[in-house]
Amino acid sequence: MKMKAFLMFVLLFLCSMGTKAQDLGANYNENIDYPITEIEMLKQSKVSWVRGFVNIPNLFLQNENGKIVGVKENAIRTHIPTLKFIQAKKALGDRVKFILSLKIPFELYTDTVPKVGTKEMEYIFQATEILLKTYDMAKNIEILVMGNEPEWENALDTDLCHADGEDYRAFLNEFANRLTTWKQTNGWTFDIYAGALNRVSELPKSETVPAVVSVVNNNPNVVGLDLHVHALKINQAEDDFRIIRDKYGVTKKLICTEFSMVRALNPHVADALGEWGTKHGYTAGMKIYEYLNLIAEKANAGTPVSATEFKSLFESYSWYPKNWYKTFYEVFKKYDTYAITGRFSVVPGGARAVYDANTEMWELGGIYFSRYLGLDADGFYNPNPLLYPDFIAARDGLAVSSLVGGQRELFIRWGNGADKTGILSVTDENGTEVVRRSLDSENDYTLVENLVPGTAYHVALLKSDDAV
């Protein structure tokens, strides 16, 4: 008999607070043409969101001598990755919502952030409006994010203290207002977010952070803020979200479209395998990047190493932040993060085709490995054993969100993982079933009464047909 069960004593007062599981998604960064190639994997993973970004200046603006001088209209209207992004949305249907972030690195230009009303700014808006109309992009996205890590992309110096904060604030306000006008004119329904701020707890002197936050807090056309967490320490996610909520007073929705601990991993890419290496058939002096190259070759040859071996290597190091995905997810829940999109897979090839001592280990932050552990029976990438168990637990949620036990009653609040078509079964310590009832699909809680103090009860959620 299939069941989700737990054991408790009702004479104890139990109180376990929980929140609804947050919606997880897949982030593809600039590779917006790639989700269409992973449709079946996306369906199998049951993600709720897909996110990508478009670099407006690099792709769609004309640049001469550090000035924006025009719009590449034909490049926008014939941009194949845009078409494939929309094709992926249509293939996945209404259950999966899409997020588009607009990356606008003003550092490319000598005047950095243009003034409101200038030709340079109008070209940015013109390119964006054409993009949103191309292939009906605007009708197929749920969220549009203005900006992508502007702390780095607006900076005039290395300490990030002088980054045209006031001009950027004016730009975002004007951008949000223009987007709202286009929405009203065209019947578009996407929500407007500002962002994406990154590593805010590390940037107390940044002009950009308070500029973006002020737009979120004060512009009624902006629904919320996008936060990126690329952390050096595992507690940084908590620090970043707390600062945004408490210091900056943001009460609107939060989303997180990128998160990783790659900065904690990168310094160790050339670490030796050491004792673990000799125990597993490698040399102690082999470096991590050499191991990664070797197992990629093995996987390509159809003889991948096991997930157990791979996981055991990284968990043998004291510096590896075990269960960091779970830790981050708990922070996302605590701060009621609306949408969360982490790295899903990594596009094979490119700059990371062969690792060396300077390669950044982004791939270790993906839910699936595109080249390390081979393919499963269905031809899909095998999952990353360092993260996948925590991803599944976070995605599915808990059957029980919270419990409160009294002397004669038990209050159960059902979590996101509960099957509301199931049967609640309560048996006493003698195996006698004292409660059997269907769950109320309209309510997230159940009250069980008339229990006997000092008695242990077994509480189970069964499938409605008691099928195995």
Each model region followed by its residue ranges:
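Aromatic- and acid-rich polysaccharide-binding/catalytic face
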Residues: 50-52, 100-102, 139-142, 148, ...
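Substrate-binding cleft/loops of secretory-pathway carbohydrate-active enzymes
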Residues: 196-226, 236, 240-241, 265-274, ...
